[in-house]
Every structure is written in C-alpha cells, then in structure tokens.
C-alpha cells in the first residue's frame, strides 16, 4: 500500500472513477474523462478544495456507480461524471462487470486491461492520411498519387505506376529492368538478325527447334521435328502397277511418225511403247 495527499479539483461523490493531475506542486483528483482509462476510484464524498489522503492498494476490483444497466460480463469504460458504462471499444476498456446492476446502482468491476486490442488506421496518430487510406484499402486516385510521391523517387517508375508512360519513360524503364541488349531490342521492337538469333538461343533449348527457327534443319533434324509434332515419316508414292495405284513419270515428248510403210510405222509404235514403259506405265 502507498499513500499520498491530494486535493479535490471539484465536488467528488464516492464510488466514482478518478484521474490525477498536478497543479502548483500539488496532486489534484477529479472525475476521469469519458472513454479513458481511469486511475482510481473515490471511496468518500469530497468538496472542491478538500484535502484528502489517497491510499493506493493493489485492488483487483472496484465498486462504481453504473451510468446505465449493466450485465455480468459486460466490458466497461468510463462514462459521464466518473460513472461506469458498457463498451465494446477495446481501447478504453479497463475491466468487466462481475455482477449485474441497474443505472445508479453500485456495480463491482474486476480490473483488467488484458483484452484483445483492435487498432485501426485512424488510431495511428500523426500518420499521413494517404497512408491511412492505403491501410484501409479505400484509396482515392488522389491518395494513390500522393503515395507514389511518398514512396517512389524515380519519375519513370512513377509514370509506370500511374499508367501514363511516354516512349522516353519506356526506354528508361527497359534500361532499369533489363541488362540483356537482345531483350531490350525485342522490347523496343527493333531487333536485328543477330538479336533474333541470340533471343532464340535465350528462349529455346531444343537444338532441332532452334535449327527450324533458324531455317537450316538438316535431314536428321527434319525427321526429329516430324516425330516431335507427330507427323511420322514422309510418304513415298509407290510405283503404279496393273493392280496398284501409284505414280508415273512424265513421258518425254514423241515426235509424230513420218512412216510411209508398215515396217517403219511398227518401229515408231514400238518406240512409243518403250517411252511409256520408261515413264512407269505397265503395258
């Protein structure tokens, strides 16, 4: 227990919540402000200016006049004129009722500030309003603009975040983001043949696909590519026979026969048959 002398700052009624203050080297007591954490409770009536001895005990419960009807288990805070009231605000809760009471009656309050405390962005004191809006996920376009000014120094990055990049901004952003010259050329839409080859080497690991993209696949690579896409092997047209549909060569041109006798005519006809057989016709 510890005691000290204090003076009543105003009329104080017993069983009301108090706060301490100092004035001219004296300690003064008065009713605790509404929605604050009280420092003590009065146990006797006092007039303004009365001198009293305050004895501080490690009390675990106070008896206080209820401002309103209170039920057992209600969390409580300071009400009007040092009375106690119900609350759901964890920031000003200092205890909970262990018995019910009607308005104007004494209620026993167990002292405890060990509650889950909910802190909202508005509780953060001098924090910038734009930051509070960001924490509450309800930023306006103006908030976003102000936050970019707070968080980002580079003008090109700001332009990117605001969705208003110029060609100059884009070029500088590419320099900020990429070190590879071929990638930069690709993003700027100005690739040379060397850039294209280097980009293909960056992007593709399969040698067959690289050969295809470089337009120089050899025969084995072509076979590999056909296998990769499920095309199988090339189709070879069979030779035409009397029973098989197939391919034939184009027969070379044959001049008109100039035969004037049967023997020469037969010779020219046989030459025609030979040309047809050479072209793949079975006769």
UniProtKB/Swiss-Prot annotation:
Signal sequence, renumbered to the chain: none
First-listed, main subcellular location of the protein, grouped into a coarse class: virion
Origin: domain of life: Viruses
A biological-process GO annotation: virion attachment to host cell
A Pfam family hit: Phage_head_fibr
Keyword terms, alphabetized: Host-virus interaction, Late protein, Viral attachment to host cell, Virion, Virus entry into host cell
GO CC terms of this entry: virion component
Keyword Transcription on entry: no
Compartment(s) of residence: Virion
InterPro entries listed in its UniProt record: Phage_B103_Gp8
Assembly with partners or alone: Homotrimer. Forms a super helix coiled coil in the homotrimer.
Function: Protein that forms the 55 capsid fibers. These fibers are not always present and may have been lost in some lab strains. They may enhance the attachment of the virions onto the host cell wall.
UniProt similarity note: Belongs to the phi29likevirus major capsid fiber protein family.
Protein name in UniProt: Capsid fiber protein
Species annotation: Bacillus phage B103 (Bacteriophage B103)
């Amino acid at each position: 227990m510890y005691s000290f002398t204090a003076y009543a700052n105003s009329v104080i009624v017993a069983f009301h919540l108090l706060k301490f203050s100092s004035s001219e080297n004296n300690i003064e007591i008065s009713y605790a402000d509404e929605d604050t954490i009280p420092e003590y409770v009065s146990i006797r009536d006092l007039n303004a200016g009365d001198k009293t001895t305050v004895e501080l005990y490690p009390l675990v419960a106070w008896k206080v006049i209820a401002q309103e009807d209170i039920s057992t288990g209600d969390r409580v805070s300071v009400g009007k004129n040092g009375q106690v009231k119900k609350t759901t605000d964890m920031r000003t809760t200092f205890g909970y009722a262990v018995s019910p009471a009607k308005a104007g009656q004494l209620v026993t309050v167990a002292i405890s500030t060990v509650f889950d405390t909910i802190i909202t962005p508005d509780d953060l004191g001098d924090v910038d309003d734009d930051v509070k809006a960001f924490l509450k996920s309800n930023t306006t376009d103006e908030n976003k603009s102000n936050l970019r000014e707070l968080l980002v120094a580079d003008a090109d990055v700001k332009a990117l975040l605001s969705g208003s990049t110029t060609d100059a901004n884009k070029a500088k952003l590419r320099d900020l983001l990429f070190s590879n010259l071929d990638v930069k050329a690709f993003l700027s839409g100005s690739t040379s043949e060397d850039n294209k080859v280097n980009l293909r080497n960056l992007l593709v690991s399969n040698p067959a696909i690289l050969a295809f993209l470089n337009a120089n696949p050899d025969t084995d690579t072509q076979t590999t590519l056909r296998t990769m896409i499920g095309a199988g092997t090339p189709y070879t047209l069979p030779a035409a026979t009397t029973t098989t549909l197939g391919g034939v060569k184009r027969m070379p041109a044959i001049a008109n026969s100039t035969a004037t006798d049967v023997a020469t005519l037969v010779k020219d006809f046989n030459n025609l048959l030979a040309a047809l057989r050479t072209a793949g016709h079975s006769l």
